Curated annotation (Swiss-Prot):
Lipidation sites (N-myristoyl glycine): G2
InterPro entries: Arf1-5-like, P-loop_NTPase, Small_GTP-bd, Small_GTPase_ARF, Small_GTPase_ARF/SAR
Official protein name in the record: ADP ribosylation factor 4
Species of provenance: Drosophila melanogaster (Fruit fly)
Keywords from the named record: ER-Golgi transport, Golgi apparatus, GTP-binding, Lipoprotein, Myristate, Nucleotide-binding, Protein transport, Transport
Length: 180
């Protein structure tokens, strides 16, 4: 016997199921990333009030991605999405130097939550096409990622509008979640 329901479903249907929570400050590019992954194209977005949820299939893994609005009034609601989250995607607007401290604070607060203790962390350093964008190395420092203990994390430079870096991030996420 010894099969978990997840591995049984994988054997029957061939796809592993993963629950991913995608958060970040407002206007970081979360919804653009979600629909670029889902549809392969750029869609016109408006600020997300509440959430979007889509299934993204990639490399025999079925990711259920929850894209939760990032406005400051909505952020206290993020915690309602933490349960059973296996992977956390934190999207940062690499060009928004004025709010990087705010992004760091929100990320660090989230990572203290007990329900996310086992979730792996993928940071999308988005908007790398803009001339003033912070590099992944600079963001690693500003987000204090090197200070994280007992957490698997990875930062990926991305440009959601062009699709650059998104699948490289999913490759890392897939590999990490396959280890669990």
């Amino acid at each position: 016997m010894g099969l978990t329901i997840s591995s049984l479903l994988t054997r029957l249907f061939g796809k592993k199921q993963m629950r991913i929570l995608m958060v970040g400050l407002d206007a970081a590019g979360k919804t653009t990333i979600l629909y670029k992954l889902k549809l392969g194209e750029i869609v016109t977005t408006i600020p997300t009030i509440g959430f979007n949820v889509e299934t993204v299939e990639y490399k025999n893994i079925c990711f259920t991605v929850w894209d939760v609005g990032g406005q400051d009034k909505i952020r206290p609601l993020w915690r309602h999405y933490f349960q059973n989250t296996q992977g956390l995607i934190f999207v940062v607007d690499s060009n928004d130097r004025d709010r990087i401290t705010e992004a760091e604070r929100e990320l660090q607060n989230m990572l203290q939550e007990d329900e996310l203790r086992d979730a792996v962390l993928l940071v999308f350093a988005n908007k790398q096409d803009l001339p003033n964008a912070m590099t992944a190395a600079e963001l690693t420092d500003k987000l204090r990622l090197n200070q994280l203990r007992n957490r698997h994390w990875f930062i990926q430079s991305t440009c959601a509008t062009q699709g650059h870096g998104l699948y490289e991030g999913l490759d890392w996420l897939s590999a990490e979640l396959a280890k669990k």
